[in-house]
Every structure is written in structure tokens, then in C-alpha cells.
């Protein structure tokens, strides 16, 4: 089977490519970082529309997709237009689109505007957030898979630490509701560190949180930092309408304790108080963190249980998830399928 993987050559995209390449050696890579290097392109992509770049986008695919493939696999690529996708369909039996973001909300402004136009021409859309189900009927998506965010063996297994010297951490980008959340935790007396982008944009709470905020991390650094802390706080993106995130799987995969906002779906994946800790408010999060830090055996037991659930019982390693995706039979299957765990 011949596969063309299209996506940026960094972060989770690169690890997704390596997972597919491991399953299917005859896999080529088309790097879309070409677009990300152009600041003017990025500005128009986020703040207006890409119509003035349509010729450039189409030329990129015309010059780089010349061979025939069994599957052309897009990895969360917003830089695609209808004209290009119609030309690409001539080169493949199937077009798969792995959608890591939420292209149906306004959080990323105009970045995903073109995606809605190409939906009818994609053979299979893969969502790794269960909450995307609500958009499937609305946008008339005929063929889709819903799975769970993967972890990467080569990243997360290499960073499992038995001894964790630091206490509480949050790793993530700033959003307005997050500044208030951590201000409440600090006001109550909880000690924590924050790693991530854009926290200095919080005009109201940054001055109170400045000493807690560390640098932004790349993907491999993220796994190392997760492994150093006893408790990793997980917050869902309100603008992205999430009910689970990649971090919810990565934290237990790295052997640390997940303390996350409570959702019905998360409780199905990781049992509350046995494999993860959940909260519905800053006050509940504070109380649970204080209790756990006084009872480190509980932290250890829950961390171990969560790690076993993600790694052994559910087997959420990327290679296993992509194997299910590549083996998905578009002809014999029903119009929709959810990979259940």
C-alpha cells in the first residue's frame, strides 16, 4: 500500500507520520511547513481569508503530489482549498483527514474557513475528540471515525519517572478563563508552576501569576516536565468545545497523576478517584490537590492505575490507533463508526 502523509514536520504531526511509517514502510511525507514560514500568509489565514493565496496553495500541491497513492492522509492541515482537493483526488483511491483541532468553532478565527468547503470530497474524517459528534450531523459528514487522543511510545515511555520531586503543574496555552482559575488557586495558597504561551496577555491576572509562569515548551520538553511533577492539572479548551484533550492521555502515559476538569466522557476512559482525579471548580481542584499532597501513596496508586489503563488495558499508543484507522474499510462499513474503548 502506498500512502502520502501531508502535514507539518514537527510536534504531534511528525510523530503521527512515524507511527504510520512504522505500520506501512511505503509512506511518503509532504511537509506543509512551507506555509508556516510565510508571516503574511499566516496573518491572512488567521485574520481574514486565504483567497489571495489560492494560486500559491494550488501550485504547492500540483508541484508536490505527482505520484498515485492508495491513501493520501492529511494531518490537521488547514492550508487546502477545493480546487486542490479535486486535483488530489485524481491521484488517490482515498483521502483521509486527521482533524486534531475543532474546525467548526471560532477559536482559531478564519484558520479553518476552507475546511468546510472540502468536507464533501474527503473519504474519511478522523476526530480524536468525542465531543465532535455534535458537529457531524450539522455539517453532513458522511464518513468519519471518532477515536481517543494517542500517546507516543518513543516520547512518553522514555520520560516515566518513579521519583517526582515537584508538586503541581499546568502545561498549556493561556485563555481568559484559565487566568482566573489559577488566580483562584493561588489566592487559596496552592503552589504550582505554569508552562505555556501567551500568559503575559492576561491583563487582569498576569501580575499575580508572573512568578509561577515558566517558559513555553516543545513537544519533547512537555513530556519531560509532565514526568517531574506529582500532580498535572488538565484544563479543557472552552473555545475548542473539548471534552477530552491530548494531555488527558499523555499525563497518565508518562506515569503522572491527571487532575482534570470533569466530563462524562473522561470518566468513561479513566475512572474517577482510581485512575484520575476530576474537579468542577477551582475550589474543588484546590481541595483535592491539598489532600493528595498530604497523602502521597494515593498519588502513587492513582498514577500507576492510570498508566496501566492507558498503556495496557486501552492500548492508546499511536501505532495501535493508526492501525485501526488504516484498516478502516470504507466500502463494507456503515456510514459512521466510533472506535470504542
Regions found by a protein language model. Name each.
Residues 61-66, 291:
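Short amphipathic alpha-helix with an adjacent loop that forms part of the alpha/beta core around
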Residues 74-76, 88-95:
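Short, conserved structural micro-motifs that define repeat-unit consensus positions
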Residues 1-61, 69, 75-84, 106, ...:
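Nucleotide-sugar donor-binding catalytic core of glycosyltransferases
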Residues 96-109:
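A short, histidine- and acid-enriched strand-loop-helix "catalytic/donor-clamping" loop
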Residues 315-341:
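C-terminal alpha-helical cap of glycosyltransferases
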Residues 298-312:
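A short, well-ordered alpha-helix in the C-terminal region of glycosyltransferases
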Residues 276-282, 291-296:
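Conserved acidic donor-binding segment of nucleotide-sugar-dependent glycosyltransferases
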Amino acid at each position: 500500500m502506498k500512502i502520502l502523509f501531508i502535514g507539518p514536520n514537527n510536534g504531534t504531526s511528525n510523530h503521527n507520520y512515524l507511527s504510520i511509517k512504522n505500520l506501512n514502510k511505503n509512506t511518503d511525507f509532504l511537509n506543509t511547513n512551507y506555509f508556516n514560514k510565510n508571516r503574511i500568509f499566516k496573518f491572512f489565514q488567521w485574520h481574514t481569508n486565504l483567497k489571495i493565496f489560492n494560486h500559491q496553495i494550488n501550485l504547492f500541491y500540483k508541484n508536490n503530489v505527482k505520484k498515485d497513492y492508495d491513501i493520501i492522509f492529511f494531518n490537521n492541515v488547514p492550508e487546502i482549498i477545493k480546487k486542490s482537493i479535486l486535483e488530489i483526488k485524481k491521484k488517490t483511491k482515498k483521502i483521509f483527514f486527521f482533524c486534531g483541532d475543532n474546525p467548526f468553532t471560532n477559536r482559531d478565527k478564519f484558520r479553518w474557513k476552507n475546511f468546510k468547503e472540502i468536507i464533501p470530497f474527503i473519504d474519511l474524517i478522523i476526530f480524536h475528540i468525542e465531543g465532535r459528534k455534535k458537529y457531524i450531523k450539522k455539517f453532513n459528514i458522511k464518513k468519519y471515525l471518532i477515536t481517543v487522543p494517542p500517546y507516543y511510545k518513543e516520547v512518553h515511555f522514555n520520560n516515566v519517572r518513579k521519583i517526582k520531586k515537584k508538586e503541581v503543574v499546568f502545561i498549556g496555552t493561556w485563555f481568559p478563563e484559565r487566568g482566573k482559575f489559577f488566580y483562584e488557586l493561588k489566592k487559596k495558597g496552592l503552589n504550582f508552576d505554569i508552562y505555556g504561551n501567551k500568559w503575559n496577555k492576561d491583563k487582569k491576572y498576569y501580575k499575580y501569576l508572573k512568578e509561577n509562569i515558566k517558559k513555553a515548551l516543545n513537544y519533547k520538553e512537555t513530556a519531560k516536565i509532565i514526568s517531574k511533577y506529582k500532580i498535572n492539572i488538565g484544563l479543557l479548551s472552552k473555545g475548542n468545545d473539548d471534552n477530552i484533550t491530548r494531555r488527558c492521555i499523555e499525563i497518565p502515559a508518562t506515569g503522572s497523576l491527571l487532575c482534570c476538569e470533569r466530563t462524562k466522557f473522561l470518566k468513561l476512559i479513566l475512572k474517577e478517584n482510581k485512575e484520575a482525579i476530576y474537579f468542577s471548580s477551582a475550589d474543588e481542584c484546590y481541595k483535592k490537590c491539598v489532600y493528595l499532597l498530604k497523602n502521597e501513596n494515593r498519588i502513587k496508586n492513582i498514577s500507576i492505575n492510570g498508566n496501566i489503563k492507558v498503556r495496557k488495558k486501552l492500548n492508546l499508543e499511536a501505532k495501535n490507533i493508526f492501525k485501526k484507522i488504516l484498516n478502516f474499510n470504507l466500502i463494507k462499513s456503515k456510514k459512521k463508526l466510533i472506535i470504542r474503548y
